[in-house]
């Protein structure tokens, strides 16, 4: 449980890092968005696949926590920019 919380917080930190560094110039927005969506879909596929989940449950839950933190952090940054 502690690893999932740490990975969620690491995902929030990573999203803040991605939003401030790579979008500074505006050139990386398309590539960064494509990589984030691909990473999100790969982690979702792995975490909801029953065969893989039975064998590596703890590692997959950690990656899923990172994914949740990343998306939540991006949502928070968008909310800050919108207000």
Swiss-Prot record:
One cellular-component annotation, GO: chloroplast
Domain of life: Eukaryota
Keyword set includes Plastid: yes
Pfam families: DUF565
Family annotation (InterPro entries): Uncharacterised_Ycf20
Primary location class: plastid
Locations listed in the record: Plastid, Chloroplast
Keywords: Chloroplast, Plastid
Keyword Chloroplast: yes
Note: Although originally identified as Cyanidium caldarium, these sequences derive from Galdieria sulphuraria.
Family, per entry: Belongs to the ycf20 family.
Name of protein: Uncharacterized protein ycf20
Organism: Galdieria sulphuraria
Lineage summary: Eukaryota, Rhodophyta, Bangiophyceae, Galdieriales, Galdieriaceae
């Amino acid at each position: 449980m502690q690893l999932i919380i740490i990975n969620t917080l690491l995902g929030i930190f990573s999203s803040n890092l991605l939003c401030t560094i790579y979008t500074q110039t505006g050139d990386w927005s398309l590539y960064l968005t494509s990589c984030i969506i691909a990473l999100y879909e790969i982690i979702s596929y792995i975490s909801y696949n029953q065969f893989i989940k039975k064998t590596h449950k703890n590692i997959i839950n950690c990656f899923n926590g990172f994914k949740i933190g990343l998306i939540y952090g991006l949502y928070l940054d968008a909310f800050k920019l919108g207000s």
